[in-house]
Swiss-Prot record:
Keywords: Cytoplasm, DNA-binding, Repeat, Transcription, Transcription regulation. It comes from Nitrosococcus oceani (strain ATCC 19707 / BCRC 17464 / JCM 30415 / NCIMB 11848 / C-107). Residues 5-52, 81-124 form the SpoVT-AbrB domain. Forms oligomers. Belongs to the MraZ family. Its main location: cytoplasm. This is Transcriptional regulator MraZ. InterPro entries: MraZ (IPR003444), MraZ_C (IPR035644), MraZ_dom (IPR020603), MraZ_N (IPR035642), MraZ_sf (IPR038619), SpoVT-AbrB_dom (IPR007159), SpoVT-AbrB_sf (IPR037914). HAMAP family: MraZ (MF_01008).
Length: 149
């Protein structure tokens, strides 16, 4: 399970050093092989251990090709999927094509999502979290008012 948020630096060659606490898990579960693809809704990338991606990919392939939304989802997720591998130093080269499709800069937030990671530009991540927190507080305030708390 991948948990927590870690701020990392992307080097000049576009490599991201995966924290040691995750390297062993990635080595055991997928021999360091991962799939990186775009996110459908957010300006971030998704990083899946290969076995987790294969589960997602099977579900995507099973979607009906005559359905417009299903085709869009498959084109985005499968079409942008890149297989990457941890090098001997625990780094992953983030493909330039994928980096250019998001707002990834030098500082990256690696966000654990249980079975995968999200990769965010750290400033974009902070803005997104502030926006979501403000929205959640408004909704929570309404719910608490209804409960008379």
């Amino acid at each position: 399970m991948f948990r927590g948020i870690t701020t990392l630096n992307l080097d000049a060659k576009g490599r991201l050093s995966i924290p040691a606490k995750y390297r062993k898990s990635l080595g055991i579960c997928c021999d360091g092989k991962v799939i990186i693809t775009v996110d459908l809704l957010e300006p971030c990338l998704q990083l899946y251990p290969l076995p987790e991606w294969e589960i997602v990919e099977r579900k995507l392939v099973a979607l009906p090709s005559h359905n417009r939304q299903a085709r869009y989802i498959k084109r985005r997720l499968i079409g942008h999927a890149e297989e990457c591998e941890l090098d001997g130093h625990g780094r992953i080269l983030l493909p330039l094509e994928l980096r250019s499709r998001t707002e990834l800069g030098k500082n990256i937030s690696l966000v654990g999502q249980g079975n995968k990671f999200e990769l965010w530009d750290s400033m974009v991540w902070e803005r997104q979290m502030a926006k979501e927190e403000a929205s959640a507080k408004e909704e929570l305030t309404r719910e608490l008012a209804l409960l008379a708390l």
